[in-house]
Curated annotation (Swiss-Prot):
The gene is nucS. It is an enzyme of class 3 (hydrolase). Residues 230-240 have a biased composition (Basic and acidic residues). Belongs to the NucS endonuclease family. It is found in: Cytoplasm. Cleaves both 3' and 5' ssDNA extremities of branched DNA structures. Binds to ssDNA. Its EC number is 3.1.-.-. The keyword Nuclease applies. This is Endonuclease NucS.
Length: 251
């Protein structure tokens, strides 16, 4: 069987056949199409007609990209179930219940890639090393902090580190290896708001970086977020894991 199967302007029947083939053989599906998107879950949203890229992975991951920005405009996590019915691709997540439907108006192209990839990513770089340091010595954030997840997927992106504080509050850490700016604060706020929708108000957001701009500091104060100063550990400097943060800011 070919590694890559491409079908231009596929019919409804051809879309179903190729989706079934991809599911059977563990293929990655990429669809270029004009479509509408309907989401129902913790809230409801509608995305009007437009040209988009739809990606379906063997683990159930489902992503819809526009022609801008890095993040998908809509997505479902691994474990979701994908079906095709009456020219609509439907992805359902059971817990919590979320339903994402892509109504195909005009399919331009469908690609099935029978990819084989068994390697795991070996993370390197300052932010990954900052996360390692935090897991090795959570006190660099604060006494009683317990990190639980790293690179945790949520509705609006991927949280660098997520854990709980001594009072049982959820704590979201956004890590930056260089001076943090307004964008970093906005990103953290988006993650905190998303988790508050799911878990309630007991969610804290902490920006972790060597420093931050004056504008970022003001926005942190305005949004009720926090800052911890932490330098990225130098390679080979294992003693850094025992160093406690020098100062922190809590509005």
């Amino acid at each position: 069987m070919r590694k890559v199967i491409i079908k231009e302007n596929p019919s409804e029947e051809e879309i179903k056949e190729l989706l079934d083939l991809a599911e059977k053989h563990g293929g990655v599906v990429t669809i270029f199409a004009r479509c509408k998107v309907h989401y129902e879950g913790r809230a409801k949203s509608e995305l009007g007609e437009g040209d988009r890229i739809i990606i379906i992975k063997p683990d159930g991951s489902f992503l819809i990209h526009q022609n801008k920005k890095r993040e998908p405009v809509n997505w479902q996590p691994p474990g979701s179930k994908v079906t095709f019915k009456e020219n609509s691709i439907i992805s359902i997540r059971r817990r919590p219940y979320e339903r994402l439907e892509v109504e195909i108006i005009e399919p331009y192209s469908l690609v099935v890639f029978l990819a084989e990839d068994y390697e795991e990513l070996a993370l390197t770089g300052s932010e990954a090393e900052m996360a390692n340091l935090i897991f090795e010595n959570p006190r660099v954030i604060e006494e009683g902090f317990k990190p639980i997840y790293r690179e945790k997927p949520i509705r609006h992106g991927i949280v660098d580190v997520m854990g709980v504080d001594k009072d049982g509050n959820i704590v979201v850490l956004e890590l930056k290896r260089r001076k943090a700016d307004l964008h970093a604060v906005s990103q953290l706020k988006r993650y905190v708001d998303s988790l508050k929708e799911e878990y309630g108000e007991n969610v804290r957001g902490i920006l972790v970086a060597p420093s931050l701009t004056e504008g970022a500091k003001k926005l942190l104060e305005k949004e009720g977020l926090e800052f911890r100063k932490l330098e990225p550990p130098k390679k080979g400097n294992e003693k850094r894991s025992k160093q406690k943060t020098l100062d922190f800011f809590t509005p």
